[in-house]
């Protein structure tokens, strides 16, 4: 169960934010094989000054169209799967809603399975 956070500036429409969430989810299904119904996302728009980023970090020019994607998921994916996931997210967001590849910043956070609770305060994956 990946938990996805997407953060954008207010200039993006609610429809664009939904399309971004759809593109990230599609990439998770295709690249690392999560079940299609396994969708948990927090999609947020922020006022100017509330989403802070370096417009030229590592020589990559970013605009106000920047999209932050943070995916928290269980450990266990190979480096190849992670690279495929990153590429699929960028490809999907470029297709719809037309996000520039330079504006997609992705952070993968891996946690051990016993750190998840899916309800009732129980660590369902703990053995």
Predicted regions mapped to residue ranges:
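Interaction-mediating elements
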Residues: 1-127
